[in-house]
UniProtKB/Swiss-Prot annotation:
It comes from Salmonella paratyphi C (strain RKS4594). Keywords: Cell inner membrane, Cell membrane, Membrane, Repeat, Signal, Transport. Part of a tripartite efflux system composed of MdtA, MdtB and MdtC. This is Multidrug resistance protein MdtA. Transmembrane segments: none annotated.
Length: 413
């Protein structure tokens, strides 16, 4: 029994080994047959990929049509807003400051009361001057009465001619004294008036320079407060010396040159004024000239020492051919645009540009009104290629679509 079992186990192991050997031999014999099939499929796949790239969708672009417009010509420069007048308010008399009649930052008018110096000493001085004047007026009246009597007595030779002349001289002297007294009264009155410190100009007051209770003097350089006149307000900016002739020519033609003030980022128009004057010399260091413009500034959009961008309108070019700035490209040979024909084929065309800003460019030569130019999708263009002109919304939707990106990746693969 034991020998019989051993024999059966030996047969089973032999069958397993034989089956394994047969499977190994069969798999080796099929692999050479399968390889030619795979290799045969490769050229077909590559060819299909190339056909897919050739037959893929047209490159989408956005386009604009060249138009004719009246284009303003601006001269631009950097500038600083300055107050039309800046006045340091000082006391013209010495004394104790007893009151301030303004709030810091307040808008004041010329003649408004700003501060009060203790007027006591000036009132006393005025009273003394007025008293002396009254005394001398009485003396003059008495001298004139004596003179009248002397004149009557002189007719009867009761007084000498010398006495009459002496009395006349006394009257004249007293009249001179009264004139001096009147001047003293006026001076004392002026000192009293000056104890009331008023605004010399209209404008905005700054921070106070002295507190109530301090003894102040007419020699104090800091003053009491500084007033800046901001209605109107001035803008001083610079232009290259090459622009001087254009400005002078416009002035001689009698034009009122409009100046615009824009914010620091040059994105928001702050105010509009007019050219006031040009400086009388060029800065040799920078080769620029200073220009002053004046603004009414009723809305207080401009503030002293504010940095702004200035634009001055000097001329307007009529019937100029204009295209969006995005259409104009720069290459080794200069500026160019991609022009579309009726079949939406593109071609590169050199142009000469003129006036330009952030949005539009004037084409001085190379284009005509009505020509279509590519404004977006330029990086995908080649000479003579046919494109698909789409609206901006369509292009944005296509760029955000995952399926389109996946399709493009597949074509490139």
């Amino acid at each position: 029994m034991k020998g019989s079992n051993t024999f059966r186990w030996a047969i089973a192991i032999g069958v397993v080994v034989a089956a394994a050997a047969f499977w190994f031999w069969h798999s080796r014999s099929e692999s050479p047959t399968a390889a030619p099939g795979v290799a045969a499929q490769a050229p077909h796949t590559a060819a299909a990929g190339r056909r897919g790239m050739r037959d893929g969708p047209l490159a989408p672009v956005q386009a604009a049509t060249a138009t004719t417009q009246a284009v303003p010509r601006y001269l631009s420069g950097l500038g600083t807003v300055t107050a039309a007048n800046t006045v340091t308010v000082r006391s013209r008399v010495d004394g104790q400051l007893i009151a301030l009649h303004f709030q810091e930052g307040q808008q004041v008018n010329a003649g408004d009361l700003l501060a009060q110096i203790d007027p006591s000493q000036f009132k006393v001085a005025l009273a003394q001057a007025q008293g002396q004047l009254a005394k001398d007026n009485a003396t003059l009246a008495n001298a004139r009465r004596d003179l009248a009597r002397y004149q009557q007595l002189a007719k009867t030779n009761l007084v000498s001619r010398q006495e009459l002349d002496a009395q006349q001289a006394l009257v004249n002297e007293t009249q001179g004294t009264i004139k001096a007294d009147e001047a003293n009264v006026a001076s004392a009155q002026l000192q009293l008036d000056w104890s009331r410190i008023t605004a010399p100009v209209s404008g905005r007051v700054g921070l106070k320079q002295v507190d109530v209770g301090n003894q102040i003097s007419s020699s104090d350089t800091a003053g009491i407060v500084v007033i800046t006149q901001t209605h109107p307000i001035d803008l001083i900016f610079t232009l290259p010396e090459s622009d001087i002739a254009t400005v002078v020519q416009a002035q001689k033609a009698g034009k009122t040159l409009v100046v615009e003030a824009w914010d620091r980022t040059n994105s928001h128009k702050l105010s509009e004024g007019v050219l006031l004057s040009l400086d009388n010399q060029i800065d040799p260091t920078t080769g620029t000239i200073k220009i002053k413009a004046r603004f009414t500034n009723q809305d207080d959009t401009l503030f002293p020492n504010q940095f702004v961008n200035a634009r001055m309108l000097v001329d307007t070019e009529q019937n100029a051919v204009v295209v969006p700035a995005a259409a104009v490209q720069m290459g080794n040979e200069g500026h160019f645009v991609w022009v579309l024909n009726d079949e939406n084929n593109v071609s590169k065309k050199r142009v000469k540009i003129g006036i330009q800003d952030n949005r539009n460019v004037v084409i001085s030569a190379g284009l005509s009104a009505g020509d279509r130019v590519v404004t977006d999708g330029i990086d995908r263009l080649t000479e003579g290629a046919k494109v698909e002109v789409v609206e901006p919304q369509t292009t944005m939707a296509d760029e955000k679509s995952p399926s389109r990106h996946e399709g493009q990746k597949g074509a490139r693969a």
